[in-house]
């Protein structure tokens, strides 16, 4: 039997995926703490941060999800999407309102002495607020259209610009982070060009995670894995930022308890934009953009699939105004769904891909 056939025959449940991912990430974080000789109840313990974030989000979900259902904060499903998704209509959305605070609070308690941790928390909340505005407009107008794309993009650029201004005030225009580190000991001095790259990274990453948030447990699980991976990477040299990473990873794992297939709640733009904004901001302040590019390769793949789909459709548009599609549907996860993959098969594959990409960073280093 080929690998492809074996994968197609593997049909895990959402519960199995949740427990497997949570156990694997917790074991990896525990191992890193042991390697660095950090006790469980030390403020620098990444396992403590992960556990607190997880516990707060998991507990909060049992209160917030029924509340969202009572106020009729149900998701509107796109009619041109996979038909199997129509049954999800009415599932509460905006779950980021409990996942994000639950992930940030332990970080601020354990590592709040670091100004960088507060800056990361603020930029995460800024993107969560932009997402909340979009979610609220969708619920208010009872359709799948939130704030206008132009306004949304302007707000994303505004938040990125303000964050970069703060960094400039701390480090100057040509601070140490403007020379970005690369694999194999290489580096690249960008000087002033670093700042447009930083703004672009924040905006593009927040949109990439937003595009990835299309299946039960997909964005939450892969996002938690990337955050935990960044925490493991940064623990020796930047313990405060690593604590932030693991705390937020715990928040998304706790959210995943309620978002695993079949989902009781969706994170909405409130969670997905905040997730991407946080991951990008971490990579910027910790000077590990190449690590983000590799660990977050799935988010890049999802974004590229949309760009290629739109570009190909426009390039092949005929006199009737209709073009050809490169994929069955974009993003990539919907293409696989329409090819006969179940949701959990796609999610399991993407979890595996993300974990492999995270592991590959140590090989590249």
UniProtKB/Swiss-Prot annotation:
Catalytic activity line of the entry: UDP-N-acetyl-alpha-D-muramoyl-L-alanyl-gamma-D-glutamyl-meso-2,6-diaminopimeloyl-D-alanyl-D-alanine + di-trans,octa-cis-undecaprenyl phosphate = di-trans,octa-cis-undecaprenyl diphospho-N-acetyl-alpha-D-muramoyl-L-alanyl-D-glutamyl-meso-2,6-diaminopimeloyl-D-alanyl-D-alanine + UMP
- Is Lyase among the key words of this record? no
Which pathway does it take part in?
Cell wall biogenesis; peptidoglycan biosynthesis
Where does it reside? Cell inner membrane
Q: Where are the transmembrane segments?
A: 47-67, 92-112, 114-134, 153-173, 180-200, 215-235, 239-259, 281-301, 344-364
Q: How does the protein's chain sit in the membrane according to the entry?
A: Multi-pass membrane protein
In terms of PROSITE patterns, this protein maps to: MRAY_2
* Protein family membership: Belongs to the glycosyltransferase 4 family. MraY subfamily.
Identification of the protein by name: Phospho-N-acetylmuramoyl-pentapeptide-transferase
Species: Synechococcus elongatus (strain ATCC 33912 / PCC 7942 / FACHB-805) (Anacystis nidulans R2)
